Amino acid sequence: MTVLPASIRIEPHGRLAPALLPRVFALVDDATDTDGVQPLSEHVVLHLRYGGDERGCNLLLWVDDDEPRLAGYAHLDATDPVEAPSAELVIAPDFRGRGLGTMLVEAILARTGGRLRLWAHGELPAAQAMARRLGFARRRVLLQMRRDLFAPLPPVTLPDDVQIRTFRPGADDDAWIALNARAFADHPEQGSWTLEDLHRRMQESWFDPDGFFLAERDGELVGFHWTKVHGSPAGQASNGSSGHGHEPLGEVYILGVDPKAQGLGLGRALTIVGLRYLRSRRLPHVMLYVDATNAPAIRLYESLGFRHWGTDVLFERGGTANGEGTS
């Protein structure tokens, strides 16, 4: 393991003190502006809004020059009882090229016994090289796809016994959590959401029930499309940090269909309904994330005009890594 120079220190924290949060978010914003991609997932950013998950660990890397400067941040989640702990990290652009990312990952590995899953958002060359150098293998690949919302959209076709309506906060919460669990039974990161996870997102400034669509059959929820808008026309903050630094962008945030309603074309219909809504908001483009191994979903999105835009990679060391795209 690399011995840290005297001018560099790595501090582990549980919840972060409120005074530290602006410094972390400023670092994240700086990296986002430089790289053109968010270095942290929404899950981590949401927890940071509240000081971090008390079950997780936040590591701060400081460089002590004339005064302490925050040069790196990492979030470590070791709560999964089966999988290796997972981490996400970011190094301030002004401090890159000094091996600080390697130091931060090695500090995390020392806490996890050498087992770790590590997300690299945007597939940046430096992150890829560091992962290979430290003995990580690709475990999963997420594709970001985008579409021009000004391009024509096909009509919505639904079975006669299915209706689409919008989400009713409070009234639909429990039923949606149950549907989400059924729809993502094979994807525990999404399917294990609790009411707290739902309510935390409902408290975000971007939450809009008018863009949260539910498919209902015989009084039962059988599918949904939750849309999201990144940024705002006024350039105001819509996440835990500052503005996004780009024009507003729509997202197919979560799309799910009850397994017993598969084959009815609900995924396609719900996608089109959401895209029409985002276009009504005068948004020029829409994005989504999809697992690289989910061929049916990729075919659906490509048939609706989406094209590959970027890639996020989950690396693993000391686990069961077996190639790309394990879901």
UniProtKB/Swiss-Prot annotation:
Taxonomic source organism: Acidothermus cellulolyticus (strain ATCC 43068 / DSM 8971 / 11B)
Top-rank taxon: Bacteria
Binding-site residues, acetyl-CoA 2: 255-257, 262-268, 294-299
Record-given protein name: Mycothiol acetyltransferase
Cross-referenced CDD domains: NAT_SF
Binding site for acetyl-CoA 1: 89-91
GO molecular function, one term: mycothiol synthase activity
Xref: InterPro entries: Acyl_CoA_acyltransferase (IPR016181), Bact_Acetyltransf (IPR050832), GNAT_dom (IPR000182), Mycothiol_AcTrfase (IPR017813)
Origin organism lineage: Bacteria, Bacillati, Actinomycetota, Actinomycetes, Acidothermales
Reactions this protein catalyses: 1D-myo-inositol 2-(L-cysteinylamino)-2-deoxy-alpha-D-glucopyranoside + acetyl-CoA = mycothiol + CoA + H(+)
Gene name of the record: mshD
